[in-house]
Amino acid sequence: MRHGYRGRRFNRTTEHRKAMFANMSAALIKHEQIVTTLPKAKDLRPVVEKLISLGRTDSIHARRLAMAQIRDADMVKKLFSVLGPRYQSRPGGYCRIMKAGFRYGDNAPMAVIEFVDRDVDARGKDSGPTSVETAEAA
């Protein structure tokens, strides 16, 4: 019996699951809206909500805990400088999940997970990985 076990396994090892949620939470912080499968979105929401709660309390300890979770310094900086102050007065419920139909290839239920009161201009700015020299030149 599986009573009392929280979360889904997604046919992945623990390390793979943790890395997947770290990457997905970094992508959500970066773009403030991502499209994924519905079960992944449902399991991603508590991870991101805890990160936003960390972002509301700007301390060295909270920054280290966030860095251990998402492993991207730029996204940690955005978490504490943009998202934390934005949701300072909101006691919880920072994300919303909207169903988005079914994927064509395997009919998997899809969902859009986004921040409540998100910045609509944050979406679509990613052009892939860039080198440090081109980022400093711009």
Swiss-Prot record:
In terms of Gene3D superfamilies, this protein maps to:
Ribosomal protein L17
Stored SUPFAM superfamilies:
Prokaryotic ribosomal protein L17 (SSF64263)
What keywords tag this UniProt record? Ribonucleoprotein, Ribosomal protein
Q: Which domain of life is it from?
A: Bacteria
Q: Does the keyword Ribosomal protein apply?
A: yes
| A biological process term (GO) from this entry | translation
Q: Does the keyword Transferase apply?
A: no
Could you state one GO cellular component term attached to this entry?
cytosolic large ribosomal subunit
Query: What's the short name of a Pfam family annotated to this entry?
Result: Ribosomal_L17
Q: Which GO terms describe its molecular function?
A: structural constituent of ribosome
> What residue ranges are annotated as transmembrane?
none
Belongs to which family? Belongs to the bacterial ribosomal protein bL17 family.
Q: How does it assemble?
A: Part of the 50S ribosomal subunit. Contacts protein L32.
Under which name does UniProt file this protein?
Large ribosomal subunit protein bL17
**What is the originating organism of this protein?**
Methylorubrum extorquens (strain CM4 / NCIMB 13688) (Methylobacterium extorquens)
Taxonomy of origin reads: Bacteria, Pseudomonadati, Pseudomonadota, Alphaproteobacteria, Hyphomicrobiales
**This protein's encoding gene:** rplQ
